[in-house]
Amino acid sequence: MKKEEKNQVVEALADQLTNNNNFYIADISELNAEDTSALRRLCFKREVTLTVVKNTLLKKAMEQTDKDLEALYDILKGPTSIMFAEAGNAPAKLIKEFRKTSERPILKGAYIEEMTYIGDEQLDF
């Protein structure tokens, strides 16, 4: 990916982070193609946007927002996906429902209405 392309991705992510008060960071690695497709279909039905992102680009985008997202920097390791939704609990419900049949996705962290949550155990907040 060229530098211009990376800058465009960072700008787009920064816009999404700025314009959404709710987003979840999850690990969907180790899902096979069938499960990944099922997860994406479920996200589409529930009006949740799911995007796989590079950690370095996501961190740069986070730094460009006026939100306090520093607590989320440490979770940006390994495979990362970001989920955006209007309703603060929509991604959490989706993750819980999907995990009835699969071990993933695993919640890494979330930003909901100016509150930061870290770790999979926060799924029931």
Identify what each model region corresponds to.
Residues 117-125:
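Phosphate-binding/catalytic loops
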